[in-house]
């Protein structure tokens, strides 16, 4: 009897982990072309691209670029606005950078190559908190400077709600049987 409860508990933990990670997305900067480089024309803007996408806490943003010739810097709003690359929050140089978006609010990235930010190789995106997560931290008041993005889709809310209910049912079943 105890071994079946242990198996159910292990299954419960795996299930909750699986269903909570199902909602995370990987979004490549720039869309299908996926290149982190100076925009080829003034008609393309990384910020306009980002406004058409939805980023939520737990998602990953992926930057693809030539390692050794470029880099990605996560910076403050002030550094983003001035294209200041001297004191980044984080620096990435591997050519295939995957950054987890772990906090709601605006996030700022610029190229670490001199002169590239001034030519438009910079990105501001807004990360939203999924409605099915009550524990994600909000943005700090000094960092948040833009409007909120619309809430997540009904499918994401349904999947999150299902994982909570499923976990509770399995937990109760394991406890009593």
UniProtKB/Swiss-Prot annotation:
> What are the lipidation residues for GPI-anchor amidated serine?
153
Could you tell me which cysteines form disulfide bridges? 83-117
Q: What results from gene inactivation?
A: No visible phenotype. Plants lacking ENODL11, ENODL12, ENODL13, ENODL14 and ENODL15 have a reduced seed set due to aborted ovules as a result of pollen tubes failling to rupture and release their sperm cell cargo.
**Propiece span(s):** 154-177
Domain Phytocyanin stretches: 25-129
Tell me the InterPro entries matching this sequence: Cupredoxin, ENL_dom, Phytocyanin-like, Phytocyanin_dom
List UniProt keywords, sorted A-Z. Cell membrane, Disulfide bond, Glycoprotein, GPI-anchor, Lipoprotein, Membrane, Signal
Q: Where is the signal peptide?
A: 1-24
CDD domains cross-referenced by the UniProt entry: OsENODL1_like (cd11019)
Q: Major location, coarse class?
A: membrane
* Glycosylation sites per record: 84
Q: What superkingdom heads the lineage?
A: Eukaryota
Query: One Pfam family from the UniProt entry?
Result: Cu_bind_like
Compartments where located: Cell membrane
> Could you tell me the membrane topology recorded for this protein?
Lipid-anchor; GPI-anchor
Look up the record and report any one GO term of the cellular component aspect. side of membrane
Q: Which family does it belong to?
A: Belongs to the early nodulin-like (ENODL) family.
Spell out the protein name for this chain. Early nodulin-like protein 15
What organism is listed for this UniProt entry? Arabidopsis thaliana
Gene that encodes the chain: ENODL15
């Amino acid at each position: 009897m105890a071994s079946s409860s242990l198996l159910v508990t292990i299954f419960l933990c795996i299930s909750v982990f699986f269903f909570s990670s199902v909602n995370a997305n990987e979004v490549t900067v720039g869309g299908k072309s996926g290149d982190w480089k100076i925009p080829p024309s003034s008609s393309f803007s990384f910020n306009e691209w980002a406004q058409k996408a939805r980023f939520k806490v737990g998602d990953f943003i992926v930057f693809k670029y030539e390692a050794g010739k470029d880099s990605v810097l996560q910076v403050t709003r002030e550094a983003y606005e001035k294209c200041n690359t001297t004191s980044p929050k984080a620096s990435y140089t591997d050519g295939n950078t995957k950054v987890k978006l772990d906090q709601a609010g605006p996030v700022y990235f610029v190229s670490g190559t001199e002169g590239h930010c001034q030519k438009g190789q910079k990105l501001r995106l807004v990360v939203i908190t999924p409605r099915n997560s009550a524990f994600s931290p909000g943005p700090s008041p000094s960092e948040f400077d833009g409007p909120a993005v619309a809430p997540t889709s009904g499918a994401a809310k349904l999947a999150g709600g299902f994982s909570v209910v499923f976990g509770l049912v399995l937990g109760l079943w394991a406890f009593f049987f």
